Amino acid sequence: MPKMKTKKAAAKRFKITATGKLKHGVAGKRHRLMSHNAKYIRQNRGTSVGAKADEARVKKYLPYGL
């Protein structure tokens, strides 16, 4: 049986932690940040843990847990 292919779009956006959770970047940080206050920008810095409902679908796109 051939190797399964990784969906590269998902591999660029998600990482799987050692415990199996999904990490992803927070949206809304590219441009037009003057309309947001400093608290919003500070809290959305870094990464976030993904929703449990989306885990199965995204893990299917990442068969080797990139």
Swiss-Prot record:
HAMAP family: Ribosomal_bL35. Pfam families: Ribosomal_L35p (PF01632). One of its GO terms (molecular function) is structural constituent of ribosome. This is Large ribosomal subunit protein bL35. The keyword Transmembrane does not apply. Keywords: Ribonucleoprotein, Ribosomal protein. GO terms for cellular component: cytosolic large ribosomal subunit. The keyword Glycosyltransferase does not apply. One of its GO terms (biological process) is translation. PANTHER family: 54S RIBOSOMAL PROTEIN BL35M, LARGE RIBOSOMAL SUBUNIT PROTEIN BL35M. Belongs to the bacterial ribosomal protein bL35 family.
